[in-house]
Amino acid sequence: SQPLSDPAVLKNLTSTITTILAVERLDYTKGIPERLQAFAAFLQRYPQYLERIQLYQIACPSRLDIQTYQQLRQQVHTLVEQINSQFATASWQPIIYQEDPVSHDNLMPLFRQCQICWVNSLKDGMNLVAKEYIAAQDEQNAGILILSKNAGAAHQLQQAILVDPTNNDSMIEGLYQALTMTKQ
């Protein structure tokens, strides 16, 4: 399949599906398995969002020579497969997963195109993805940032919906809040 950042793919993002973007290194500090589990629990709790939302998870592998990172990669692949097989329909799958890195030039249009960005760091410094997502937004059609309270940027980005990346209910309700704020 084509990378999410491909301009042809960007044009195909339809207004009928709310797109949620998550982009980071495949690293245990980024809270990827926790986000995926919360996303599955969200779909279970709010089935009215089936076929109405899609998570674009971009996870660039790093340190794959280290066994714990290999195990994390396998865990993420397994979760994506399980969630997609549980909830997918003939015309929709809940998670699009990509490991190909995205260039900065392609990331900016992707930030503008996706209605929600979800940064779920378990522990993080400033987290530039959160700041870049906010900076890339068009004032007339700004996206919504779901941000881990453990990201350093959480203290500066007051407009973000803050979530606890270790608490499923916090993430589920943060996503619900973001979705009810987006223009449907």
Describe the function of each predicted region.
Residues 2-20, 47-50:
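Nucleotide-sugar donor-binding and catalytic loop/hinge architecture
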Residues 13-29, 36, 55-56:
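Conserved donor-binding/catalytic core segment of Leloir-type glycosyltransferases
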